């Protein structure tokens, strides 16, 4: 299995929207609110691709699109990166790819000077929660901005 991590090419923007839409459904079990969520997404991606510290990555396995990452090496908390999206297409879930994706995030954030990563995950996304708990992520607190999600943290290996 040859895994390649490549910065998102905006010419492949439809892959970004497809990934975000499926991730939204995995998180919440419905598409209600997705149109509002995705509004302005292309502009945000373009802006962030040009901004240091942002990582918008497409994952390919043996040349086939397998998933998408969105994360940054800064947050309001010192030495802390924030993960906005870890997405794998359904046919790559359970394939052993997810731990390698986490290793990529950890390596990238560590090189950027982060000691910790934080993400917000839906309480109903049981598959993601199971993975996070098995791979070192710890519950931090409820997300005050979203009733259905909680913050988890991962201390990065140094």
Where are these regions (language model features)?
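A generic secondary-structure micro-motif detector
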Residues: 35, 95, 117-118
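Conserved glycine-rich acetyl-CoA-binding loop
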Residues: 89-103, 112, 123-130, 134-135
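C-terminal "cap" of GNAT-fold acetyltransferases
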Residues: 115-118, 122-126, 134-158
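Acetyl-CoA-dependent GNAT
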Residues: 3-85, 89-91, 102-104, 108, ...
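Tryptophan-centered motif/residue detector
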Residues: 108-109, 137
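A general structural signal for short secondary-structure boundary/capping elements
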Residues: 48-53, 105, 114-119, 130-132
